[in-house]
UniProtKB/Swiss-Prot annotation:
It comes from the Archaea. This is 3-dehydroquinate synthase. It is an enzyme of class 1 (oxidoreductase). It comes from Methanobrevibacter smithii (strain ATCC 35061 / DSM 861 / OCM 144 / PS). Keywords: Amino-acid biosynthesis, Aromatic amino acid biosynthesis, NAD, Oxidoreductase. The lineage of its organism: Archaea, Methanobacteriati, Methanobacteriota, Methanomada group, Methanobacteria. Belongs to the archaeal-type DHQ synthase family. Catalyzes the oxidative deamination and cyclization of 2-amino-3,7-dideoxy-D-threo-hept-6-ulosonic acid (ADH) to yield 3-dehydroquinate (DHQ), which is fed into the canonical shikimic pathway of aromatic amino acid biosynthesis. InterPro entries: DHQ_synth.
Length: 368
């Protein structure tokens, strides 16, 4: 939320927010000016806004008296009308009593986003509203006043809150809260140690180099494999070699049919990746961060098959057969495909759920 300040001060706040990765701004006064600052989604009670706002200057913020009969709610009727007109709708509700809690639930069944404001969530726990909206297709945004409030709200993320909104007061506050949200959204994968059971040089195939917009450090790479539910940690080209200069932004990922883990615990085929797509960078501890594809390079190269076993499950991947291509061993050291041998211990990720269109589902699918 933009502060009630002169435009020049507000502009600096919004610019800092955009640089910190914040992409939504709620503002009622300077829609046209904000549009010129960058690619940002503006939430406002204007027909031209990216997201149409209901609730401010209405029942949501207490400007209008809320009837006990929610069917008579002006905010609810306005939200329904906006949805019929094809707008993306955000509802704003200050939770001051049980009646406004019910208004939030009703609006949540209509709106695409709902902003919830409360001075004390111990009076009406946020979890109550989340539980009531569990089956609704709405993103729940909790309003916070400061960094401590953001930390508290972020702890609730796992229970159903989709984000936070705050009024910008200073530049450090913006950066700290933005970083909190980024850190909370990171997934950590439980990497296992598998035993190599087969190493087989093959002929040539089309392999993909994923060049990202980030510089990776030693120990970082991507989760890649022939099976969507069992992936090797393939190391980045962040190490120096006597044969070629390092390319810390690159993962020589494997052939076109291989899967790669991307944000949201989804997988994609390497052949699908294009500039601008998101991918996950993973380190030896399973910690992740999001990066963007700057370029995907497909070239004909000799391949090598690597098979490993974990708790009776066979894991396979194909990689380019070159000394500079590495996976990661059990001691978190890069292991060149030129040096891999049967019996080596390597880092893998294995999940029990199958995947449908890259999304994990509880279903039996056999891959071999």
């Amino acid at each position: 939320m933009t502060p009630n300040k002169p435009w020049d001060d507000k502009k600096e706040m919004i610019t800092t927010a955009l640089e910190s990765g914040i992409s939504y701004v709620l503002d009622l006064d300077d829609y046209d000016k904000i549009q010129k600052l960058g690619n940002v989604k503006i939430v406002a009670n204007s027909d031209d806004a990216d997201i149409y706002l209901v609730g401010i200057n209405g029942e949501g913020d207490g400007s209008l008296i809320l009837s006990e009969d929610l069917n008579q709610s002006q905010d609810l009727q306005e939200a329904k009308k906006a949805k019929r007109e094809g707008k993306t709708v955000c509802a704003y509700v200050e939770i001051t009593d049980k009646n406004h809690e019910q208004l939030a639930v009703s609006l949540g069944s209509v709106a695409d986003y709902i902003i919830l404001i409360s001075t004390d969530w111990t009076v009406i726990p946020l979890e109550n509203i989340i539980a009531d909206l569990q089956k609704a297709d709405v993103k729940i945004i909790a309003a916070v006043a400061d960094e401590d409030g953001a930390k508290l709200a972020i702890e609730t993320l796992e229970h159903g809150t989709d984000g936070v909104i705050f009024e910008a007061n200073d530049f450090n506050q913006i950066k700290k809260i933005a970083q909190l949200v980024v850190d909370a959204s990171k997934i950590k994968y439980d990497l296992k140690v598998a035993t190599v059971t087969n190493v087989k040089p093959l002929g040539s195939g089309d392999r993909v180099c994923v060049d990202t917009t980030d510089m990776m450090k030693p120990g970082e790479g991507m989760l890649i494999g022939s099976y969507s539910k069992s992936l090797f940690l393939v190391h980045s080209e962040s190490l120096e070699s006597e044969y070629v200069a390092s390319r810390p932004f690159r993962v020589n990922a494997g052939p076109v049919q291989a899967y790669v883990m991307v944000p949201g615990n989804k997988t994609r085929y390497l052949s699908e990746l294009v500039a601008g797509d998101e991918v996950l960078i993973v380190n030896t501890e399973g910690e992740t961060r999001t990066a963007y594809v700057g370029r995907s390079k497909i070239e004909r190269r000799p391949l090598i098959l690597i098979e490993a076993e974990y708790e009776g499950k066979t894991i396979r991947t194909l990689l380019q057969n070159a000394e500079t291509i590495r996976i990661v061993d059990a001691d978190n050291n890069p292991l060149s495909v030129a040096d891999i041998k049967i019996g080596d211990k390597v880092k893998v990720y294995v999940e029990s759920n199958a995947r449908h269109f890259g999304i994990a589902i509880d279903e039996t699918i056999i891959e071999q």
